From Swiss-Prot:
Name of the protein: Small ribosomal subunit protein uS11
Annotated InterPro entries: Ribosomal_uS11 (IPR001971), Ribosomal_uS11_bac-type (IPR019981), Ribosomal_uS11_CS (IPR018102), Ribosomal_uS11_sf (IPR036967)
Keywords: Ribonucleoprotein, Ribosomal protein, RNA-binding, rRNA-binding
GO cellular component: ribonucleoprotein complex; ribosome
Pfam families reported in the protein's UniProt record: Ribosomal_S11 (PF00411)
Family: Belongs to the universal ribosomal protein uS11 family.
Protein species of origin: Bartonella quintana (strain Toulouse)
Purpose: Located on the platform of the 30S subunit, it bridges several disparate RNA helices of the 16S rRNA. Forms part of the Shine-Dalgarno cleft in the 70S ribosome.
Length: 129
């Protein structure tokens, strides 16, 4: 039986003026996701998706490139102003934020939503080099 040809779905342009940027910066990678007010993803990017591999994913420059790519995708949907939620202890927090500002977005608020335990799980052992 012949396979049915898969259609390529074209992304329709949504007119969304404001959104929320979630910057998840870990020790190994930086993920940037732009959502609307309800939490539906509009655009996303990461340092690994931009072609950085290994330890280069955790650099501030890789986070900047990922944020610029995500900003370009969001501007295609007509987005103008952003709220920023930063999560995680990684190196790409500030550089991703600066890249969004230089892309021409109006940043209305910046929130740090890094989860901090109230003496919850035992942390992993200290690294000895």
């Amino acid at each position: 039986m012949a396979k049915q040809a898969t259609r390529v779905r074209r992304r329709e342009r949504k007119n969304i003026l404001s959104g929320v940027v979630h910057i998840n910066s870990t020790f190994n990678n930086t993920m940037v996701t732009i959502t609307d007010a309800q939490g539906n993803a509009i655009a996303w990017s990461s340092a690994g998706a931009q072609g950085f591999k290994g330890s280069r994913k955790s650099t501030p420059f890789a986070a900047q490139v990922a944020a610029e790519d995500c900003a370009r995708k969001a501007q295609e949907h007509g987005m103008r102003s952003l709220e920023v939620e930063v999560c995680g202890p990684g190196a790409g927090r500030e550089s991703a934020l600066r890249a969004l500002q230089s892309a021409g977005f109006v940043i209305t608020s910046i929130r740090d939503v890094t989860p901090i335990p109230h003496n919850g799980c035992r942390p992993r052992k200290r690294r000895r080099v």
